[in-house]
Amino acid sequence: MNILIVGLGYAGNRFLRAFLHLDEQGYLDEPLKLAYVNRTKRKHTLQYYSSLSEALGAFDPQIVVVSVNDENHADILLQLRGYSGHVVCEKPLVNANNDLEATFDALSSISGFSFDLIERYSLISTSLKNFIEEKGLKLLRGNFYWGKDRINDRRPTCGATSEIIHALDLMQWLCPNEGHFKLQDVSGVISDYSVSGNDVLDTVAISSRLGNAVVTGYSSFVNIVRQRTLDLVFASSSGELVYAHMIFDTPNWDEDNLRVWKRLAGGNEIELMTISTDENRFGTALHTIYKLVQLCSDVLDQVYRQYPPSISSADLTTAVSLQRQLNEIERRA
């Protein structure tokens, strides 16, 4: 199984760690062979290629991981025209000034696509999604807060749209039967916080609707602490209000918590579900990449074992739909 990583920076090295971990665990019956494309050769024993075209011809990968900087996604994806393997792509798909339709068309020959929205792979996410479906809950209200500190970060970025995508996706993925997402109001802040320029979107607040449900949210790259929360209010089939509170990566990476409850007329609360993934993985091979390993194993299952995508998988159609939403947010911010 040949896997090509395009861009061996921060994100690319995370993917490398995830696939190497699965290989060391003997996840497949055959070894994984990894190679990379990068502007410069790194201190790795992996096969290095200076160009994507050279790598596609010489290495013949079954999986291509696109983990270059945001601004270079479109260029790499366009170079994959005619490629017939499986593509794994970091978010966002492209930037607002790229030709989205041309990018989508360039990927018409691929056998599969996996978008890196790893919060879907958390136990709290899949558990809540199944609970919503089993209980027939209807979303009334959603709110999110999604931020972290990227001030003076050396990694280039397209801005806060790269952060808000996680919350936008989770809301729609958790509640797929509510209807279409419609953006109503947007407020944004542009600053020189990033090495990418003097006018990069650092913060955005939105109000929107998902079907008839109101969804509000705030996302920022100038949050001084990592803060990733979703709050949801549902109506049950009997008319009771059901509340869900999700916290991701707090206090450490991959430590997620979910609480679901209902409140009675007298104010008393009844716990319906509590889930915590607070195992401390600091110092282990899975530190900061536990959910990413789940995504990578899903990809290997699809490509090697020909399994259908898991419930958590985000496909190309999802990536394009989210990109259209991000483009509108950036245009109106």
Indicate residue ranges for each PLM-predicted region.
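N-terminal Rossmann-like dinucleotide-binding module
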Residues: M1-H44, A58-F59
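A structural signal for well-ordered alpha-helical segments within the folded catalytic domains
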Residues: G9, N13, A74, S122-T126, ...
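Alpha-helix termini
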Residues: L20-E30, S53-D60, P176-F181, Q302-Y307
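C-terminal helix-rich "cap/oligomerization" subdomain common to oxidoreductases
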Residues: Y27, I63-V68, I289-A333
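Beta-loop-alpha module in the N-terminal Rossmann-like domain of NAD(P)-dependent dehydrogenases
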Residues: Q47-A106
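A contiguous active-site-proximal alpha/beta segment in oxidoreductase catalytic domains
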Residues: V94-R154
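Rossmann-like dinucleotide-binding domain that binds NAD(P)(H)
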Residues: I151-D231, T317, S321
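NAD(P)-dinucleotide binding in Rossmann-like oxidoreductases
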Residues: V214-Q294
